Amino acid sequence: MPSEEKSLVESYEKLKELSWLIGEWTNTEGNEFSKETWTRKNDSTFSGFSYTQVENDTVFAEELLLSQKAEEVYLTVVAYGQNSDTPITFTRVSTEENAATFENKLHDFPQRIVYTQPTSDSIHAWVEGDVN
């Protein structure tokens, strides 16, 4: 009787569900300009960078990493000048078509980060939670 072999090839389908994030996204409101860029680093990881400028002065910048480990998808954020530049990891708690929510209930603020893609040429991102 032939023995069954376990496939060593991992599937990253849960991360692939977020492929709509990949690209360059910009927003201008008055004198404020924001840009977020996502690229596919490999099968299990997307990397991102986001910044906001007001009158050409960078007032916010962060590195982002989306990764799938086993069946979980994690969003790790390093917001420069916050949390001593320590990476903070959020776990995906829900995914709908073109929407994802990540949560870390132990973080002071935010506890949730939400991404949506309302149309093919835009994404929306916001944070939620209590200020501890």
Q: What residue spans do the PLM features occupy?
A:
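Short, conserved beta-turn/loop elements at beta-strand boundaries and strand-helix junctions
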Residues: D43, S120-D121
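N-terminal helix-cap/turn-to-beta initiation motif at the start of protein domains
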Residues: V9-E24, Q68
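Short, exposed beta-strand-loop hairpins at the edges of beta-sheets
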Residues: V114-P118, H124-N132
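Amphipathic alpha-helical hairpins
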Residues: E4, K16-E17, T39-K41, N132
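Bacterial Sec-dependent N-terminal signal peptides
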Residues: M1-V9
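Central antiparallel beta-sheet cores of small beta-barrel/beta-sandwich binding domains
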Residues: N27-T28, F33-L106
